[in-house]
Amino acid sequence: MSYSVVVIGGGATGTGTARDLAMRGFDVTLVERGNLTEGTTGRTHGHLHSGARYAVSDKESAVDCMRENRVLHRIAGHCIEDTGGLFVQLEGDSDDYFERKLAGCAECDIPTEVISGEEARRREPYLTDAVERAIWVPDGAVDPFRLCVANAASAVEHGARIETHAEVVDLVVEGGRVAGVEVKRQGPNHHSEGAAGDTETFEADYVVSATGAWAGQLAAMAGVDLEMAISKGAMVVTNVRQLDTVINRCLPKGEGDTIIPHETTVLLGANDDPVDDPDDYPEEQWEVDMMIDIASEMVPVVADARMIRAYWGVRPLYDPNPKSTTDPGDVTRNYFVLDHAERDGVAGFASVVGGKLTTYREMAESVSDHVCEVLGVEEPCRTDEVPLPGSADPSALDEYMDEFDLRSPIARRSGQRLGDRAPEVLDIDEPNPTLCECEAVTRAEVRDAIDQVGADLNGVRLRTRASMGNCQGGFCSHRLGAELYPDHGAEVARDAVDELYQERWKGQRHALWGEQLSQAMLNAMLHATTMNHDANHVAGDENIEYRAFDGGRTAVPEGSHGD
């Protein structure tokens, strides 16, 4: 007998759960109110934890992280960059805590190497001279977008249905059990032509909430009280990659003391401040300034780096002992599977909460095991053994460089993104120009993404990184829109470009000084005037002097980052 399960949430845990259940033979439907990665997954800094960060304060989480770090290297190699990590001790930092960190890593089976400050600077020349010594650990960088999409693709390959832009507006509760979900369409997706505002009900034998920070709101639809310990964090993106190693400050408790190299950029962050509503919290300039100031204590060059955007995310923390602390930093990073039949008397419903991106697969396995136990299904988990799509043979990608007429850097970037899917995606019968020069994204990759998500350029961005470089879509958004025109028409293409451009603008608002301000005004010239997107730009008496914004570094005002 095939049981039906609805998974709510299109982040890493949700898509991982959909994959796991589909591989065990369940009839799975995943619903997500926006794009995949719309919530916490798409707003992390992509840190593949070794567990060392928690080796003193949260050993259970540390052990989970190291174990899953090894698993993800086996099944998702094309989503990971093996940067390694350094926990650096600066002058004045605690010797005692450094030794406790080493001992904690040993207890949690986390490999370490102690190196001198001189050796640390040899490996990473931009580190401050104040670094006295450091602990090397097997941290890394993981692409959360690629990882999430790969899980969704695998779920579909095993028969699952992925419904994006489908917001759950109610849980169907009958006779004391959750029997399905009611969704409201936010617009058409690749699997449904439903119009915005349409509603649809998906019946299910079991419903899993993998909604992270939104789990409390979802549970309330079934009359369940689930209190989350949500916290926010700001992250800042530089325009170039100053480092090749993940850098952490070796302190007992820190905010904003992590620097992560990712693709062509470096990410700084994040602070840890409690919020009540995951959809409504302040995003403030002082947070951006603080991230830059803290990071520059370890890597001074960051203070003068060009920042291209800032973004905020919320942590889906769960405290099994509510009100035990008011400091989010004290809340465990462990995860929990909450059986609402046992906990709240509402059957057919479970929430998976807490955890980290690094442990998403284990979280998915645990909640899938729970579903199997409740429904009497005896099928083992295989997600720790079966590689995700694109991960089977990443090394083979180099062979496609000449075959598909790609210049070396573009071939490398395309290969990293596509994994072993490169041959099927890049083998086209027409020219394959680069549409996004900043991130080296080709037409073939863009068209492949459009085939997956339809006329949704933000969905294309998540799958390819197009528009995520220095220009933030200024030079490529219209090219991406042009790829929609043949099948979707001019109006749809224009709307898609506008949505992409607005999303890109949102992240730039807190990074508008110096060279990035010049870039923003150049984008305004191109799109608002030359392309006439702002048809009324000459309606008033204002006369914008664009050259005034072209001062580069010398134009940075005193106080710099918005002080």
Swiss-Prot record:
CDD domains attached to this UniProt entry: GlpA-like_Fer2_BFD-like
Cofactor: FAD; FMN
EC number(s) per entry: 1.1.5.3
Enzyme class name: oxidoreductase
One record GO biological process: glycerol catabolic process
Record flagged with keyword Iron: no
UniProt-annotated binding residues for FAD: 4-32
Catalysis performed (reactions): a quinone + sn-glycerol 3-phosphate = dihydroxyacetone phosphate + a quinol
Entry keyword set: Cell membrane, FAD, Flavoprotein, Membrane, Oxidoreductase, Plasmid
Top-level lineage group: Archaea
Localisation: Cell membrane
Effect of loss of the gene: No visible phenotype.
Any one of the GO CC terms: plasma membrane
Listed PROSITE patterns: FAD_G3PDH_1, FAD_G3PDH_2
Subunit structure: Composed of a catalytic GlpA/B dimer and of membrane bound GlpC.
Anything else known: H.volcanii contains 2 glpABC operons, one located on the main chromosome and the other on megaplasmid pHV4.
Protein name, UniProt field: Anaerobic glycerol-3-phosphate dehydrogenase subunit A2
Gene: gpdA2
